[in-house]
């Protein structure tokens, strides 16, 4: 922007030179134009009383006048050239200053317009980025996901074969970037201009979590959440770094005390899985959170009484009445179950969490669900951490550890399920307005991607980020013959991904070679002893 301001300034100098040259040309033409009739009458005639000598004297006088005038013009042109050269040197010096950050800052002080142009450019970057409104995207692969972070860890999708899904930032620039974002947020929260005199000071200990993503042609967006002054209150700051100074976009106070979540679970049989699900639901939703409604949509009548019995026992033991049981006939359809459960709600606009029976979530995730949704503006598509087969992971142990010890985010224990879009938080009004699920899809897979694409094609912001409190528990996957070829392929890919990590699968493939090597080593050791 500084360069553009200097270009505008030099263009004005060039225009000034052109005008001066035009003025000089006009003066020259006026000077060279023959005089009027009265002056022509004063010229001596060749046959007049003064004769030829008088005429030559007049010509010599006129020639001397023109010579003096031309010399004057040459001096003015030389002066203009010197001024133009000086201005050009200043322009080149300005270009050099533009590459030096310190000189640039001092240049802002000297050039208020250049500084204003720079600020206008940076704010234009904010408007172009997906900050205030969603951008229509062609496919699910065009969406830019967020990464999430706390004070100690970063939870990232792109790991390759060397990085980890959860890790401390090793690179200094990444650490400094996130630290600067938190410090900028704290500075804003503690600013005397924006806070009340009696407000407590905020510190890094109040920081809960943040998400960020980079649009490579615009900048990096940060959404940081801090503890509020009261229970269920939070402070959220949205910051944007447009490849330059970080800028605060907005500051808002959020009160989530009355934000109810309707957890909708479609189900057919799988009583044991549902029993484990309700144990987690009772601890996280009833005992810890207390702002949750449960909707179970059950297909068929086989084992239905067992499922209803689990619900009734939980209701009596925990004094929990906020649940709905819906029974549907016909074959299982996840999309239909979720659609019916969402439309069955008769209260005010409610936040929906589409969940499966083999999902484990924490109470912290429920707040993350609330923080990343907004009716008419944002929907939340978390990337959950999918557990590998415990029988493979802990095959060399004496016993498989309890579930609580298995749910750790490591490369050896699971992976970010970035190809799954089934677990989602969105307001009922947005779900209805977007058209809900495609009810023509039967069986496993496809309905979640279809709904996700609808939101990508809309003007709503789709928040896509890995979360540390949402886990997919491993279970053996059966791909039925009734599935279409595309569904069957998706099912088999999911089955392969669920078993173990790249290294662990390699150990299984080469286990015979490893065992043979160990036998040889054992034989060598025994032969040396003898």
UniProtKB/Swiss-Prot annotation:
Listed GO biological process terms: cartilage development; chondroitin sulfate proteoglycan biosynthetic process; chondroitin sulfate proteoglycan metabolic process; endochondral ossification; extracellular matrix organization; UDP-glucuronate metabolic process; UDP-N-acetylgalactosamine metabolic process
Coiled-coil segments on the chain, per record: 57-93
Annotated residues for binding of a divalent metal cation: 358, 475
Membrane topology (UniProt): Single-pass type II membrane protein
Cytoplasmic side: 1-12
Reactions it catalyzes: 3-O-(beta-D-GlcA-(1->3)-beta-D-Gal-(1->3)-beta-D-Gal-(1->4)-beta-D-Xyl)-L-seryl-[protein] + UDP-N-acetyl-alpha-D-galactosamine = 3-O-(beta-D-GalNAc-(1->4)-beta-D-GlcA-(1->3)-beta-D-Gal-(1->3)-beta-D-Gal-(1->4)-beta-D-Xyl)-L-seryl-[protein] + UDP + H(+)
GO molecular function, one term: glucuronylgalactosylproteoglycan 4-beta-N-acetylgalactosaminyltransferase activity
Keyword Transmembrane helix among UniProt keywords: yes
Keyword Transmembrane annotated: yes
Stretches with biased composition (Polar residues): 91-105
Region of interest (Disordered), ranges: 88-107
PANTHER family listed in its UniProt record: CHONDROITIN SULFATE N-ACETYLGALACTOSAMINYLTRANSFERASE 1 (PTHR12369:SF19), CHONDROITIN SYNTHASE (PTHR12369)
Similarity annotation: Belongs to the chondroitin N-acetylgalactosaminyltransferase family.
Record protein name field: Chondroitin sulfate N-acetylgalactosaminyltransferase 1
Naturally occurring in which organism (per UniProt): Mus musculus
Gene name linked to the record: Csgalnact1
């Amino acid at each position: 922007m500084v360069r553009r301001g200097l270009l505008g300034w030099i263009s004005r100098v060039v225009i000034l030179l052109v005008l001066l040259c035009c003025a000089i040309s006009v003066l020259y033409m006026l000077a060279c134009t023959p005089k009027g009739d009265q002056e022509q009458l004063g010229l001596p005639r060749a046959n007049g009383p003064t004769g030829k000598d008088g005429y030559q004297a007049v010509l010599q006088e006129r020639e001397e006048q023109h010579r003096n005038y031309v010399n004057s013009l040459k001096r003015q042109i030389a002066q203009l050239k010197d001024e133009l050269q000086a201005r050009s040197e200043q322009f080149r010096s300005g270009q050099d200053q533009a590459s030096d950050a310190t000189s640039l800052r001092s240049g802002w002080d000297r050039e208020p317009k250049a500084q204003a142009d720079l600020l206008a450019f940076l704010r234009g970057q904010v408007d172009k980025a997906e900050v205030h409104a969603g951008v229509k995207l062609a496919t699910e692969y065009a969406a830019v996901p967020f990464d999430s972070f706390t004070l100690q860890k970063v939870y990232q999708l792109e790991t390759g074969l060397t990085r980890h899904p959860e890790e401390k930032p090793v690179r200094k620039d990444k650490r400094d970037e996130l630290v600067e974002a938190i410090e900028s947020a704290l500075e804003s929260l503690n600013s005397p201009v924006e806070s009340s005199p009696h407000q407590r000071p905020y510190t890094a200990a109040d920081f809960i979590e943040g998400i960020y993503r980079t649009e490579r042609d615009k900048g990096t967006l940060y959404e940081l959440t801090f503890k509020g002054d009261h229970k269920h209150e939070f402070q959220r700051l949205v910051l944007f770094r447009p490849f330059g100074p970080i800028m605060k976009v907005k500051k808002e106070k959020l009160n989530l005390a009355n934000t109810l979540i309707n957890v909708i679970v479609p189900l057919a049989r799988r009583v044991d899985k549902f029993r484990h699900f309700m144990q987690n639901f009772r601890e996280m939703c009833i005992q810890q959170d207390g702002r949750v409604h449960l909707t179970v949509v059950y297909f068929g009548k086989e084992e239905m009484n067992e499922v209803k019995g689990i619900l009734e026992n939980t209701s009596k033991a925990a004094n929990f009445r906020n649940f709905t049981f819906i029974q549907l006939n016909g074959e299982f359809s996840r999309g239909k179950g979720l659609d019916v459960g969402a439309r069955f709600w008769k209260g005010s606009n409610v936040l929906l969490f589409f969940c499966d029976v083999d999902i484990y979530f924490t109470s912290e995730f429920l707040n993350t669900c609330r923080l990343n949704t907004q009716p008419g503006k944002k929907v939340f598509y978390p990337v959950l951490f999918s557990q590998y087969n415990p029988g493979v992971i802990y095959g060399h142990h004496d016993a498989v550890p309890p579930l609580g010890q298995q749910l750790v985010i490591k490369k050896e224990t699971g992976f970010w399920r970035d190809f799954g879009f089934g677990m989602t938080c969105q307001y009922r009004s947005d779900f209805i307005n977007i058209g809900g699920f495609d009810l023509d899809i039967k069986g496993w897979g496809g309905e979640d991607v279809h709904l996700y694409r609808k939101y990508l094609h809309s003007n709503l912001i789709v928040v896509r980020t890995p979360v540390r409190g949402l886990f997919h528990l491993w279970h053996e996957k059966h791909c039925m013959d009734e599935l279409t070829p595309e569904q069957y392929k998706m099912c088999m890919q999911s089955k392969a991904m669920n078993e173990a990590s790249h290294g662990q699968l390699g150990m299984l493939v080469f286990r015979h070679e490893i065992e043979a090597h160990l036998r040889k080593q054992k034989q060598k050791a025994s032969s040396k002893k003898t």
